[in-house]
């Protein structure tokens, strides 16, 4: 199709495409198009777009009389609307509301009423183009454009085209960026409220605002997961003082932990993104329970210096699960050890500090040891595309006793690193899945540990189903 001076004329809900170099300069052309479009008996349909070839020099009147002559094939314009049905998705309510607000801002006075009337009467109609005349023709055909809008309101049910945004705008595309992700940590942390950005940011919800397209689980898959849950957990002694309890947490307990973490995370002292004095931010969201851990001073305290909030209390259910898991690990160590006092490898612990870390799909945590200022450690691992991790350490006296760190994994699988040296290449790897509990104390108390990556492996479907119906808001 050879057109050299092509332009689009937006007339009401019509788009008339014209090669101006191949038309006679007639001031009555636009009026003729309008009359033809509004004439029910006209051969020119409201949804037609005509492209005139450059070498075809004829008037508009000649075009419509030529269709009845034998030379129709030589003068008939090319129609870019091919004879096939277009299949598309219906716009969402959110998209329609956003476009209504955009369009409303562009109109004023009577035009705004016309627009609202048009949009409200076209629930089942897909529109194409904007309800305005293009800038190029706005001054010349403003009356004609207004007339077309009024007439098309009453004839909207006869028009079936595809809706798209008339005016592109980037103003609405940046409002969904998380203020938590972009905030900067104040260089000092010696008092509350040092970061105005953090204190004013909205609470972070670990239920991420995105839809995950998943197929409905088959009965075979559901039965397999039920059998796995009924089978119970299995214990593995990784190294002296380190025990992995596979599939230890029941689905109900996993749902309970996630819902309580979400509920606490949306309140005072909830999830935030910690950082350092140089402005660097950790690749996770953190919430402290019992006491606050300051990553800059590496000390625990009664308040969070960044905003002065008081950490929530540790739920009783969490402490009960920790105590029960440690007893199971002691029993496992005693069974697998040749030593008569093998069960003393992992001391009993009643946690008083819980650091909950939430990782998204790109989250990670470098190799580190629990500081000598830590009080206790308790790890949750990720949920639904995120990753939760908590550390509970103790003072020097507690470190000498080898009080353990307890890590609960919930959600997607995580690649967990551990080793005696702070060297990623020499570190060993464990894949922690939803429901796993990892405990390391005594001789493994000072082991370096971290999270390399979050794997795109979703937790059991039963977990999702129970979470949907039992979530605490």
Curated annotation (Swiss-Prot):
Recorded GO MF terms: DNA N6-methyladenine demethylase activity; metal ion binding
Keywords of this entry: Dioxygenase, DNA damage, DNA repair, Iron, Metal-binding, Oxidoreductase
Entry binding sites for Fe cation: 368, 391, 449
Cofactor binding summary note: Binds 1 Fe(2+) ion per subunit.
Thylakoid found in the keyword field: no
Keyword Membrane part of the UniProt annotation: no
InterPro entries, alphabetized: Alkb, AlkB-like, AlkB-like_sf
Co-factor(s): Fe(2+)
E.C. number(s) listed in UniProt: 1.14.11.51
Residues involved in 2-oxoglutarate binding: 357-359, 461-465
Domain of life from the UniProt record: Eukaryota
Disulfide links within the chain: none
GO cellular component, one term: nucleus
Catalytic activity annotation: an N(6)-methyl-2'-deoxyadenosine in DNA + 2-oxoglutarate + O2 = a 2'-deoxyadenosine in DNA + formaldehyde + succinate + CO2
Leading EC class: oxidoreductase
UniProt similarity note: Belongs to the alkB family.
Known function: Dioxygenase that may catalyzes DNA N(6)-methyladenine (6 mA) demethylation. Requires molecular oxygen, alpha-ketoglutarate and iron.
Name assigned to this protein: Probable DNA N(6)-methyladenine demethylase ALKBH1B
